[in-house]
């Protein structure tokens, strides 16, 4: 059989934010495929794979070099710019891609799931619900079905990366179907799942590490660049939405609106007030952790608000973000501290003389972690994980604002005179004070009221009857009380200062 692949997966906002290369090496099926990528430099790529076997297949996490995309001429900076620009699509092709993570735990002991249990769970879901297994060596590390994938974060956080869908009704149905499947298998194993932004009870030493090569490299590097990076890896969960743009100008508008409003999203979804079994002084510990993870690859990207900003400026930024690794001969090679700019010039000491492929570039882009991230779509990354209604509300909030021209323009007008210092202040303070954060002559709550109205109006103008998905956050805006503050009320009240009750309260 012959399959034509588009380069490195569809550019719709569907696939992983981790650095698993997308030109998957597929076994147990016979494949002969050829694909090409057109740019101003007319790069062409070719790959042939053949092997016999049955129709069901296993997808390996990353391609061996010999099966990887090989460029017929060296990549240029323009190719990297063109790669981002290739995400532009007409409005009728805009989609919604939602990702969420959750903590698995033993229902009896509340202890985190071990890898052996996760492996059993993944195999169970694959067999019962017809998913294809994603392997790294002999270890199962994820599942794929159509354009959906399930993957593992470093501490075993269980992630669904949804397919690119047209409406929020489809998105919420996808989340419900996933939670049903996971629950069906997990309950038989005595496993539950928790929707929260930060591991509330267990210390970092209690969290098992998943057998993925890239995480070994990150684990060694993180303590060199920040004090909280390991907590980010092992103890946080998020929900994010990935959205399309029509042009460079549209990308810039959405990027700026997304960054300006990200602290409001952080406050609305703040849901991580406990660490090591006690209140931690934050409403979003998860968001705070990103402020001391790695300054080179995180933050509010002030340059996005420069008049000169565009695809090229993001490429310049990404070229100078230190790399984590390259993947060659079925192994992750540690390239920490070196830059993609060095790689482009063939000057990586870890693989002397080698030049990057677009696959390497795609992987590198996924190791950058700002509050809004650009790939061939935009990722809104400011929200804590939470219960299923909020998993549907987060994409609803951003779709209502960014996919409606009127609401988007109103947000841009509203935030146009916000200074860099104000945006940074909001980003840092909402993690503690949520919607009660003072802003200008009022509270952030007052801005959030206006923004939620714009999101609702934007959804109504879309005409799909989607505004009901905002109900899960409407109460937060009305009262100014974040989900985290509700949990703290319970902790100091009927839970009698025992965090164990949160595993029941936020059980999926």
Curated annotation (Swiss-Prot):
GO cellular component: chloroplast
GO terms classed as biological process: glutathione biosynthetic process
UniProt keyword annotations, A-Z: ATP-binding, Chloroplast, Disulfide bond, Glutathione biosynthesis, Ligase, Nucleotide-binding, Plastid, Transit peptide
Compartments, record wording: Plastid, Chloroplast
Highest taxon, organism lineage: Eukaryota
Positions of transmembrane segments: none
Pathway: Sulfur metabolism; glutathione biosynthesis; glutathione from L-cysteine and L-glutamate: step 1/2
A Pfam family annotated for this UniProt entry: GCS2
SS bond list: 172-392, 335-350
Catalytic activity entry: L-cysteine + L-glutamate + ATP = gamma-L-glutamyl-L-cysteine + ADP + phosphate + H(+)
GO MF, any single term: ATP binding
Main EC class the enzyme belongs to: ligase
SUPFAM superfamilies, per database record: Glutamine synthetase/guanido kinase (SSF55931)
EC number: 6.3.2.2
Post-translational modification: The Cys-172-Cys-392 disulfide bridge is known to modulate the enzyme activity according to the redox status. The oxidized form constitutes the active enzyme.
Targeting presequence: 1-59
Family: Belongs to the carboxylate-amine ligase family. Glutamate--cysteine ligase type 2 subfamily.
Quaternary state and interactors: Homodimer or monomer when oxidized or reduced, respectively.
Name of this protein: Glutamate--cysteine ligase, chloroplastic
Organism the protein comes from: Medicago truncatula
Organism phylogeny: Eukaryota, Viridiplantae, Streptophyta, Embryophyta, Tracheophyta
Gene giving rise to this polypeptide: GSH1
